């Protein structure tokens, strides 16, 4: 936004000036190449994935695409800052190239780095990298699944309509967990009366007891 004040003199010899009311004229925002103003990693106004996708669909050029241009100036990028939760566990690999980086590297090795946030020590931080090890130990300690015996004629699974198929029919799976009846060349398979019941219990109160209903 810009404010324009028009100064109009009363006459040529008079020193009094007349100020007209301020007029606000919206100025068009100027886009700048991102490579010309950004010289650090942090971006204070990072565009969203939706915004980048919209510019890609519109076919914007590089000077209009939000991925390669920005409304921020070089001063905005230089003054932008952020704070970390604490001191990182591992130092950056690029600290040995500059003199400041070498000093920080020596402080890291000597343990003289002070936490950015007071009261947060390195020993108090939760370690999220042990999740995979904890999960593997949990899985190894848990019980193994017992596979069904192939020699038995009928396998009993409580709560599901399970049927036994001969190997010459399917050539692959012997046990089918289809809960709904299927129609094929062998005819319709028998369906238990409580298959569609949500609780899948024999004689449940939420399903009609069909075996007690007379058929005549």
Curated annotation (Swiss-Prot):
One of its GO terms (cellular component) is axonemal A tubule inner sheath. Keywords: Cell projection, Cilium, Cytoplasm, Cytoskeleton, Flagellum. InterPro entries: SPMIP8. It is found in: Cytoplasm, Cytoskeleton, Flagellum axoneme. Its main location: cytoplasm. One of its GO terms (biological process) is sexual reproduction. The keyword Repeat does not apply. The keyword Cytoplasm applies. Microtubule inner protein component of sperm flagellar doublet microtubules. Microtubule inner protein (MIP) part of the dynein-decorated doublet microtubules (DMTs) in flagellum axoneme. May serve to reinforce and thus stabilize the microtubule structure in the sperm flagella. PANTHER family: TESTIS, PROSTATE AND PLACENTA-EXPRESSED PROTEIN. This is Sperm microtubule inner protein 8.
């Amino acid at each position: 936004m810009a404010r324009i004040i028009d100064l109009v003199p009363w006459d040529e010899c008079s020193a009094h000036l007349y100020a007209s009311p301020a007029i606000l004229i919206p100025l068009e925002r100027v886009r700048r190449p991102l490579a010309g103003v950004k010289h650090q990693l942090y971006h204070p106004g990072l565009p969203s994935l939706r915004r980048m996708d919209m510019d890609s669909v519109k076919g914007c050029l590089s000077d209009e695409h939000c991925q390669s241009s920005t409304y921020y100036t070089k001063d905005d990028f230089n003054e932008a800052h952020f704070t970390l939760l604490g001191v990182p566990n591992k130092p950056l690999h690029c600290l040995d190239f500059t003199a400041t980086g070498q000093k920080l590297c020596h402080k890291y090795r000597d343990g003289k780095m002070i936490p950015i946030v007071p009261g947060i020590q390195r020993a108090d931080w939760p370690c999220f990298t042990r999740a995979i090890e904890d999960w593997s130990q949990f899985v190894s300690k848990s019980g193994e699944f017992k596979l069904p015996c192939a020699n038995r004629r009928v396998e009993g699974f409580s709560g599901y309509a399970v049927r036994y198929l001969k190997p010459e029919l399917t050539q692959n799976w012997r046990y089918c967990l289809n809960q709904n009846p299927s129609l094929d060349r062998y005819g319709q398979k028998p369906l238990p009366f409580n298959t569609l019941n949500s609780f899948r219990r024999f004689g449940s109160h939420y399903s009609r007891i069909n075996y007690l209903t007379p058929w005549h």
